[in-house]
């Protein structure tokens, strides 16, 4: 497992040289965006296999630590079939579909989502973590709250991604 974690650190270090810090954080965490009002001067990104699909976030004065999930099999991580399976698992639940509908209408914070669904905030966190891992939602901090937003670019790509995985010859043919 250590080689997997080292490889992820090397990959993120290389990305850090080519992309803005906010984009790197969002990519590593699967959709967490730091708000502009965060008083953070340093960010630490640390990969973990054990917290999947959750991110563990700890804050110290001026420093925020993101422990983010990585896949065990790096050869499959990011593969189209694996990502599509994660996406369909995420939308294969009526509660998560309702969440997508709600945040598609407007961004919402956690307790607001839980209240509208009639579930505990812990249950809402579970559903939102799966949706975030599938890149269907992102969370943005603002005013001390995390707001959840639909990622319309992922929704728009579902059909195309399924066709890619199935292969052009399989789609529409018998």
In which residue ranges do the predicted regions lie?
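DNA-contacting interfaces and partner/effector-binding or oligomerization modules
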Residues: 1-61
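Conserved segment of winged-helix/HTH DNA-binding domains
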Residues: 147-174
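Beta-hairpin "wing" of winged helix-turn-helix
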Residues: 134-142
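Residues within helix-turn-helix
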Residues: 110-111, 122, 129
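Short capping segments at the starts of secondary-structure elements
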Residues: 105-109
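A short acidic, leucine-rich amphipathic alpha-helix
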Residues: 99, 112-116
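Pre-recognition alpha-helix immediately N-terminal to the DNA-recognition helix
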Residues: 86, 97-99
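Short amphipathic alpha-helical boundary/capping segments
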Residues: 83-91
């Amino acid at each position: 497992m250590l080689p997997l974690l080292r490889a992820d650190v090397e990959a993120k270090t290389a990305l850090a040289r080519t992309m803005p810090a906010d984009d790197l954080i969002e990519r590593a965490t699967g959709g967490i965006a730091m708000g502009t009002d965060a008083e953070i001067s340093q960010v630490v990104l640390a990969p973990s296999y054990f917290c999947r699909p959750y991110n563990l976030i700890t804050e110290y004065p001026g420093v925020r630590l993101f422990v983010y999930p990585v896949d065990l099999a790096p050869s499959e991580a990011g593969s189209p079939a694996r990502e599509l399976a994660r996406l369909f698992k995420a939308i294969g639940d009526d509660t998560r579909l309702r969440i997508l509908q709600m945040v598609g209408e407007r961004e919402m914070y956690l307790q607001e989502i839980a209240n509208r669904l009639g579930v505990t905030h812990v249950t809402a966190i579970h559903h939102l973590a799966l949706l975030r891992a599938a890149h269907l939602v992102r969370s943005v901090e603002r005013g001390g709250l995390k707001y959840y937003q639909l990622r319309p670019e992922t929704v728009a790509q579902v059909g195309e991604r399924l066709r890619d995985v199935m292969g052009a010859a399989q789609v529409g043919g018998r």
